[in-house]
Amino acid sequence: MSWMVSVTGSIFAAWMALALVGEVARHGSITYIFGGFAPPLGIVFHIDGLGAMMALLIASAGLMAAIYSGHSLNAEVRAEKHTLMQSGFLLCQAGLLGLVSTGDAFNAFVFLEVSSIGTYALIAVGEARDRRALPAAFNYLIMGTIGATFYLIGLGFLYAATGTLNMADMAARLVTLGDSTVVQAGFAFIVVGLGIKAAMFPLHGWLPGAYAYAPSLISIFLAATATKASLYLIARFVFDIFPHGAAFGQGFITWVLAPLAATAAIVCSIQAVFEKEVRRMLAFSSVAQVGFILLGLSLATSAGFSGAMLYLLAHALLKMTLFMAIGALALSLRFRTLNEIAGIARDAPWSAAALGVGAASLAGVPLTVGFLAKWRLIEAALQAGQVWIVVVLAIASLLTLLYVGRIVEAVFFRAAPAGAPRALHGRRP
């Protein structure tokens, strides 16, 4: 029953998000005022093209994960916790949808925490499958709370300087306050706080455990949406709210954000190369890809912004595909490491094929969506004269090819180890 409610709610959310995309395409941005109080005093939802696409991404990922959970929950979660699981999942989905819809900076904090609270509980529920889910959930709780606190402190600085929490009104008032130390401190606190939520290096310690040990339903949904929503909010603040776009915080972006993003792209790719557990490998890969997106944003140009958002959407689809394929294989074949996945294509051809397609796109094989997104980032970097970013992207892409190649080699070309468990219950996932 709880699964049916979850699927029905997710179908409704996806349908509404699709309708919203159509309305925005026809009429431009949409503003909805709550309670009859006009902004900036009243609470407002404001949806533009990017917000509508993010809503569609979140709702679609939620629908796919909800449908998928019909087979995975019985194996990964105790029966008495199924209702709790689906309730938390819908709460998390609602919070993220509110986050990309609101036009109020404080309500963005509220929605961010609504989604996070649901996520903490959902990761912990995975302890039935792996006891490491409990410390992973606790680590996420601690880091998430620190990130939320930083965001709230930064928002307090901005409110003290502007006297408003409405994003559009705040942007208008900040134009004359660009030299304010209070505003600059608020900028730094907000970017760092959201960076923790987005798993920005070196504040990403919560992510590998959360992705690796959570139930498949949550791994799929988190991989597609959680860090992406925080990155979306960073982009909103950097390009839409602070004066003169990203040029306002250019010193912070140039000397802090961009170097950390470059380090993440390379260091976390190296960690993925040497990781043995498949889910943790994909988790480190996600941190590296966050670095790719932040490098695009750090260019402080419209081309960099569009390239970063394209890469964000592409990566969400790729990671959702990869975690669904890994989850399907793990349910039937009971594996964790690359050695245990060896030769799996013979027993599970369809899931292996999906895994191969997702891996190829993640590596940036030509004609895939991953290649197109990386190419757009490279073009933006060259247009901005930032050749060093192109070099970083090239090195990180080669490292991506290495760890993706390990997965493909194990799945398609390596012989299965003697006595390895193979398809259970007669299924061919």
Q: PLM features: residue spans?
A:
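Short phosphate-coordinating micro-motif centered on Lys-Gly-acidic
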Residues: 113
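Interfacial loop-to-transmembrane junctions
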Residues: 414-429
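Transmembrane helix-loop-helix hairpins at membrane boundaries of multipass inner-membrane proteins
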Residues: 1-87, 168-172
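Internal alpha-helical transmembrane segments of multi-pass membrane proteins
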Residues: 4, 340-343, 422
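Hydrophobic transmembrane alpha-helices and their helix-loop junctions in integral membrane proteins
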Residues: 64-74, 89, 93-108, 120-375, ...
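Acidic/polar loop patches that form or flank catalytic/metal-binding clefts of enzymes
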Residues: 2, 353-354, 419-420
